[in-house]
Amino acid sequence: MYYKLVLSHYSKTSTLINITLIKHLINILRERMIQEIKNFIYKYYIEPAEKGTGYNIVQEITYGIILALALYLFYKALRKLNINIDEKFAIPGIVFTVLIALMRALVDCGYIERSFLTITPGIVFLIGGFFILTILTTGLVFKEKYYKASAVIGLILLLYFLFVFLQHITHLEAILYVGILVGIFYYLVKFLDKTLKLNIIQSKIDDYVVIGQLIDASATTIGIGVYGYWEQHPIPRFLMETFGVYAFIPFKLLIILLALYILNKEVEDENIKNIIKLCIMALGLAPGLRDLFRTVMGV
């Protein structure tokens, strides 16, 4: 009997020890997992922003997913308000894209304090969120004239920062260099599209896409080739290191024209087609203008 009691006590004690040990191991694993997650976030998201080392593949994929999700939800809200994604919608879209680019450049020159909300992607979330709120609010209040009200709101902010920008100009000729490249390649595309009857450029929004992406490619090329800047994004950086800086413009142009060709041929819904196109435009116009503004300010 005594032996059974001792054995029972030993068994209970052993069970308690095992449970305590398991809990301890779980806590260790949980703490280690949390620390690994923190290290991952710091390594791939925070550290590159703090040190200005450029973007990495993990960031590109993450921000791409966030952009796609935000775009989908925004599109659904627009359709509920019966707002069509057309040339009118593009007007405030362009204004706010320029605003993001100019503010980001003013962060680089030190006028705006550097923080998560004033650098990419934080500034895109901030101004992009304000743009979405502006469009939805003016859509409710002004109905079909929403785009005028939205553009005016964006212009008020833009004019203030533009005044600041004008006080920091050091390389005004950079605008001419970029403008010449954009003009040459844009009219070359229009000429070939018409002469060869490719029918790739079908609307003003298609023009905006080509011009926006050409501004990005041209500003990058001039910034690196003439003024000694470097490319932050890994894929363009690899291409320029492999094929040369000036090969980036025709390469990017081919990709954009192929994207437009596929969209115009395969996507029937005009609203879906146009919101994708405007997104492509903004992805070129925003970084392109930022690079150009930086170059002009000598930052």
UniProtKB/Swiss-Prot annotation:
Membrane-spanning segments: 54-74, 89-109, 122-142, 149-169, 172-192, 208-228, 243-263
InterPro entries in alphabetical order: DUF63
Membrane topology: Multi-pass membrane protein
Any matching Pfam family: DUF63
Keyword flag Transmembrane helix: yes
Cellular component terms per the entry's GO annotation: plasma membrane
Compartment(s) of residence: Cell membrane
Major localization class: membrane
Keywords, sorted A to Z: Cell membrane, Membrane, Transmembrane, Transmembrane helix
Domain of life of the source: Archaea
The protein's name: Uncharacterized protein MJ0440
Organism: Methanocaldococcus jannaschii (strain ATCC 43067 / DSM 2661 / JAL-1 / JCM 10045 / NBRC 100440)
